[in-house]
Structure formats: structure tokens, C-alpha cells
């Protein structure tokens, strides 16, 4: 009886060790593949907000962290520096619209050195399907309405939805969501316009960041 218990215990121990080893080996073998997929995903998003023609560097490796309440979060946000022939051409920066209808909306905006928006994309949201989710490019092209826009003293008040006297469309039955995104993009552009040199001169300390 005692020998049988010992034998069973030894068998279980061997099985546990083998299972643990298999899990560890699987994680080791898939780690590089996961990293590669994350980099591809990040590169795809970055190239939507900063055209490939505008840079010759790897954007996901040219990242710095910035913190400011204008970016809608108390966390440091990544900013990706685009360069061509060693000269800065644009910045893609993540920010948050904290006042979406169903919570925070995470976005990324590409802005060139003249202050022109090259593109904006929604990274994550929890907005209502069929209503607020129209901010998602997979649903409508509304988010592309920021492309080509600039922010200055003369047009600051136009950076609102039409219901509030601005130039951006709201959605039928869903004004809160686009209002939150327009405000967040406006704040982001204003932040970059004000702090561009500071951002460009910071150390690159967050390459490969993606959530």
C-alpha cells in the first residue's frame, strides 16, 4: 500500500515537472513570434497615421514617453518620432478621450512638423455598437475627417461637433462619443504644437510599446 502511494506520488511529480517544462518551452518558443506580431500590429497603426512616404525610420523603435493632463491620462503616453534623412518629419502620439459615452477612448494621432494632422485612429473603445462605434474605421470613415486639419487661434472654436457650433459631424443618437474624440484630438494637437521641440529632444525610451 505504502509503495503504491509512493509510486503514484512519484508519477504525479514527474508529470507535473514535465507539464511545467512543456509550458515554459512553449512560452519561450512563442515569445519572439508574439513580439513580432505586436510590432507588425503597431507598425500597421503607425503607418495609418504617418504615411510611409513621410519617414525612413522604424517608428516603433523611435518612441519617447510624455506626460501631460492634456493627453487625457495620468499615465505617460508614447510618442513616436518620424524622421527622414535624420530630420524629424512628424510625431504620432497616443492620448485618451476620458469622457466617452461608455468610458475612455484611446486614440493615436499623427501630426507633422507644420502642425497638420496626418491621420487619427481609435486604438480601443467600448462605445455602443451601431451608435458610438462609428468612430472606428472598421465601421465608418468618420475618424478620417481629422486628416489635413490644423489647429490655430483662428479656428480653435471650429474644433467641435456641429451641434456645438463646430465643423465635425456628430452621429444620429450619439453626440457624446464624437464630441469626446474631437476634444481629445484637439487637445492632442495643441499639446504637440506647444511642446514639439521638447518631445523631439527627449530620449527614446519606450521602443516597441503597444497595448
Curated annotation (Swiss-Prot):
Its main location: membrane. One of its GO terms (biological process) is electron transport chain. Keywords: Cell inner membrane, Cell membrane, Electron transport, Flavoprotein, FMN, Membrane, Phosphoprotein, Translocase, Transmembrane, Transmembrane helix, Transport. Its cofactor is FMN. This is Ion-translocating oxidoreductase complex subunit G. It is a single-pass membrane protein. The keyword Lyase does not apply. Belongs to the RnfG family. Part of a membrane-bound complex that couples electron transfer with translocation of ions across the membrane. The modification FMN phosphoryl threonine is found at residue 175. The lineage of its organism: Bacteria, Pseudomonadati, Pseudomonadota, Gammaproteobacteria, Vibrionales. It is found in: Cell inner membrane. Its EC number is 7.-.-.-. One of its GO terms (molecular function) is electron transfer activity. The complex is composed of six subunits: RnfA, RnfB, RnfC, RnfD, RnfE and RnfG. SMART domains: FMN_bind (SM00900). It comes from Vibrio vulnificus (strain YJ016).
Amino acid at each position: 500500500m505504502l509503495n503504491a502511494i509512493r509510486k503514484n506520488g512519484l508519477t504525479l511529480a514527474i508529470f507535473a515537472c514535465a507539464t511545467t517544462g512543456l509550458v515554459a518551452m512553449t512560452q519561450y518558443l512563442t515569445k519572439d513570434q508574439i513580439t513580432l506580431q505586436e510590432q507588425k500590429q503597431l507598425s500597421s497603426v503607425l503607418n495609418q497615421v504617418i504615411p510611409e512616404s513621410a519617414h525612413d525610420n522604424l517608428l516603433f523603435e523611435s518612441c519617447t514617453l510624455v506626460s501631460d493632463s492634456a493627453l487625457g491620462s495620468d499615465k505617460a503616453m508614447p510618442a513616436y518620432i518620424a524622421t527622414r534623412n535624420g530630420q524629424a518629419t512628424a510625431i504620432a502620439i497616443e492620448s485618451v478621450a476620458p469622457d466617452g459615452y461608455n468610458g475612455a477612448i484611446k486614440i493615436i494621432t499623427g501630426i507633422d512638423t507644420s502642425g497638420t494632422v496626418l491621420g487619427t485612429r481609435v486604438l480601443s473603445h467600448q462605445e455602443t455598437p451601431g451608435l458610438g462605434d462609428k468612430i472606428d474605421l472598421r465601421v465608418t470613415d468618420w475618424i478620417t475627417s481629422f486628416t489635413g486639419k490644423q489647429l490655430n487661434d483662428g479656428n480653435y472654436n471650429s474644433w467641435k461637433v456641429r451641434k456645438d457650433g463646430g465643423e465635425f459631424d456628430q452621429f444620429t443618437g450619439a453626440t457624446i462619443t464624437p464630441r469626446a474624440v474631437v476634444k481629445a484630438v484637439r487637445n492632442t494637437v495643441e499639446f504637440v504644437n506647444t511642446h514639439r521641440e521638447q518631445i523631439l529632444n527627449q530620449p527614446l525610451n519606450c521602443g516597441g510599446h503597444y497595448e
